[in-house]
Swiss-Prot record:
It comes from Pseudomonas syringae pv. syringae (strain B728a). InterPro entries: Aminotrans_V_dom, Pser_aminoTfrase, PyrdxlP-dep_Trfase, PyrdxlP-dep_Trfase_major, PyrdxlP-dep_Trfase_small. Pathway: Amino-acid biosynthesis; L-serine biosynthesis; L-serine from 3-phospho-D-glycerate: step 2/3; Cofactor biosynthesis; pyridoxine 5'-phosphate biosynthesis; pyridoxine 5'-phosphate from D-erythrose 4-phosphate: step 3/5. This is Phosphoserine aminotransferase. Its cofactor is pyridoxal 5'-phosphate. Homodimer. GO terms for molecular function: O-phospho-L-serine:2-oxoglutarate aminotransferase activity; pyridoxal phosphate binding. Pfam families: Aminotran_5 (PF00266). GO terms for biological process: L-serine biosynthetic process; pyridoxine biosynthetic process. Pyridoxal 5'-phosphate binds at residues 77-78, 103, 153, 173, 196, 238-239.
Length: 361
């Protein structure tokens, strides 16, 4: 096999090599059954065992309390932008949203189709380079829920704290930072996460929802989008994305083998610190984000001269450092360093950046 590259893609993102090798070994013949997971009935004993283990492993990793349901759904996080409102926002009701970047804004725009949305705080006041402190927020006393995105993959902002919302359920889009470190699930009413960053391949979204929030869907909510229907049917109201579910389960197994989220969190802290420390010490590279609000998962950086962007990317590709181009809306570069990216990838990137700076700085 040719040497695998270091993949810094924001999503679909790198998967652990051990998971890919396991999937490869089981592709044609899962556990001696003579068929692939892709060919199994989702209601077979074999697949039900896969699904059950995946859920239990995720519960173990995040210490999910028993009064929360874990759902494996379709449509990605973008579908959740509507699904949340259809389930949790009553007719003539109101919800509070925190704006920290493009993904927050997409959630706000979609939810606005179904009710009154109060933007309780916005990072726009800081040009999206810092997160407004909670003392600046203007939360509604009668909000059905408070929604925020703990990590903005495009801008590179991340909360290092959990908002206080009292009795109002806190809803979080954790598509890009779930499983990156320990988390107190009990602080949230609901968490959702598209799989293709820290969970598995694209095609599935994980929803962790407190049981008392089920059964609130509006009359116009399609059956397929009703969280209670999904929970009552074990996430199998219709045929689920079985391959993505299976692969996500393999990632959960791998995470447990690595020592769980505590061990992964320590690795991630070292990874992000190594990269940011180099960028901050450099004269060629820069990161504009307020230091306490910097993302552990997505590190945007710019070169002092935009004319160097193309040669930088070409050289990176030649060195097996892939998908470093920043999002088209912000430009520059971005290194997405999710759980599957190890310190060797960070060291290789820093070494290349040093060499490039010596040549072009």
């Amino acid at each position: 096999m040719s040497k695998r590259a270091f993949n810094f893609c924001a999503g679909p993102a790198a998967l652990p090599e051990a998971v890919l090798l396991r999937a490869q070994a089981e592709l044609l013949d899962w556990h001696g059954k003579g068929l692939s997971v892709m060919e199994m009935s989702h209601r077979s004993d074999e697949f039900v065992s896969i699904a059950t283990k995946a859920e239990q492993d995720l519960r173990d990793l995040l210490s999910i309390p028993s009064n929360y349901k874990v759902l494996f759904l379709q449509g990605g996080a973008s579908q959740q932008f509507a699904q949340i409102a259809l389930n949790l926002l009553p007719e003539n009701g109101k919800a509070d949203y925190i704006d920290t970047g493009i993904w927050s804004q997409k959630a706000i725009d979609e939810a606005s189709r179904y009710g009154a949305i109060n933007v309780a705080a916005s990072a726009k006041a800081y040009d999206y380079f810092a997160i407004p402190g909670q003392n600046e927020w203007k939360l509604s006393k009668d909000a059905a829920y408070v929604h925020y995105a703990p990590n903005e993959t495009i801008g590179g902002l991340e909360f290092n704290w959990i908002p206080e919302t009292g009795d109002v359920p806190l809803v979080a889009d954790m598509s890009s930072d779930i499983l990156s470190r320990p988390l107190d699930i009990s602080r949230f009413g609901m968490i959702y996460a598209g799989a293709q960053k820290n969970i598995g391949p694209s095609g599935i979204v994980v929803v962790i929802i407190r049981e008392d929030l089920l059964g609130r869907a509006r009359s116009l909510c399609p059956t397929m989008l009703d969280y209670k229907v999904a929970a009552d049917n074990g996430s199998m109201y219709n045929t689920p994305p079985t391959l993505a579910w299976y692969l996500s389960g393999l990632v959960f197994e791998w995470l447990k083998e690595q020592g769980g989220v505590e061990a992964i969190g320590k690795r991630n802290e070292i990874k992000q610190r190594t990269l940011y420390d180099f960028i901050d010490a450099s004269e060629l590279y820069s990161n504009p984000i307020n230091k306490p609000d910097r993302s552990w998962m997505n590190v945007p950086f710019r070169l002092a001269d935009d004319r160097l962007d193309k040669p930088f990317l070409a050289g990176a590709d030649a060195n097996g450092l892939l998908n470093l181009k920043g999002h088209r809306s912000v430009g520059g570069m971005r290194a997405s360093i999710y759980n599957a990216i190890d310190i060797n990838a960070i060291n290789a990137l820093v070494a290349y950046m040093k060499d490039f700076e010596k040549e072009h700085g």
